[in-house]
């Protein structure tokens, strides 16, 4: 049993695709919030 091959199979599964899509959306929203909220707090921007 190799963990690497198991992770690859899990990563390619449909569930993983949904999770990755959700993760990307969450990262985008998080980055957007950081940029919008951070620009007010950081002086000189």
From Swiss-Prot:
<dbReference type="GO" id="GO:0005576">
    <property type="term" value="C:extracellular region"/>
</dbReference>
<comment type="function">
    <text>At high concentrations, acts as a pore former in cellular membranes and causes the leakage of the cells. At submicromolar concentrations, degranulates granulocytes and has a weak hemolytic activity against human red blood cells. Also strongly inhibits the production of superoxide anions. Has a strong antibacterial activity against Gram-negative bacteria but is less active against Gram-positive bacteria. Also has antifungal activity. Induces reversible G-protein dependent Ca(2+) release from intracellular stores and increase Ca(2+) influx in HL-60 cells.</text>
</comment>
<keyword id="KW-1053">Target membrane</keyword>
<keyword id="KW-0964">Secreted</keyword>
<keyword id="KW-0929">Antimicrobial</keyword>
<comment type="similarity">
    <text>Belongs to the non-disulfide-bridged peptide (NDBP) superfamily. Long chain multifunctional peptide (group 2) family.</text>
</comment>
<comment type="subunit">
    <text>Monomer and homodimer.</text>
</comment>
<keyword id="KW-0812">Transmembrane</keyword>
<keyword id="KW-1052">Target cell membrane</keyword>
<keyword id="KW-0472">Membrane</keyword>
<keyword id="KW-0354">Hemolysis</keyword>
<dbReference type="GO" id="GO:0090729">
    <property type="term" value="F:toxin activity"/>
</dbReference>
<dbReference type="GO" id="GO:0016020">
    <property type="term" value="C:membrane"/>
</dbReference>
<keyword id="KW-0204">Cytolysis</keyword>
<dbReference type="GO" id="GO:0006811">
    <property type="term" value="P:monoatomic ion transport"/>
</dbReference>
<dbReference type="GO" id="GO:0050832">
    <property type="term" value="P:defense response to fungus"/>
</dbReference>
<keyword id="KW-0813">Transport</keyword>
<keyword id="KW-0800">Toxin</keyword>
<dbReference type="GO" id="GO:0031640">
    <property type="term" value="P:killing of cells of another organism"/>
</dbReference>
<keyword id="KW-0406">Ion transport</keyword>
<protein>
    <recommendedName>
        <fullName>Parabutoporin</fullName>
    </recommendedName>
</protein>
<dbReference type="GO" id="GO:0042742">
    <property type="term" value="P:defense response to bacterium"/>
</dbReference>
<keyword id="KW-0295">Fungicide</keyword>
<dbReference type="GO" id="GO:0044218">
    <property type="term" value="C:other organism cell membrane"/>
</dbReference>
<keyword id="KW-0044">Antibiotic</keyword>
């Amino acid at each position: 049993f190799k963990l690497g091959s198991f992770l690859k199979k899990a990563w390619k599964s449909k569930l993983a695709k949904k999770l990755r899509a959700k993760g990307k959306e969450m990262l985008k929203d998080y980055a957007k919030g950081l940029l919008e909220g951070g620009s007010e707090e950081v002086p000189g921007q």
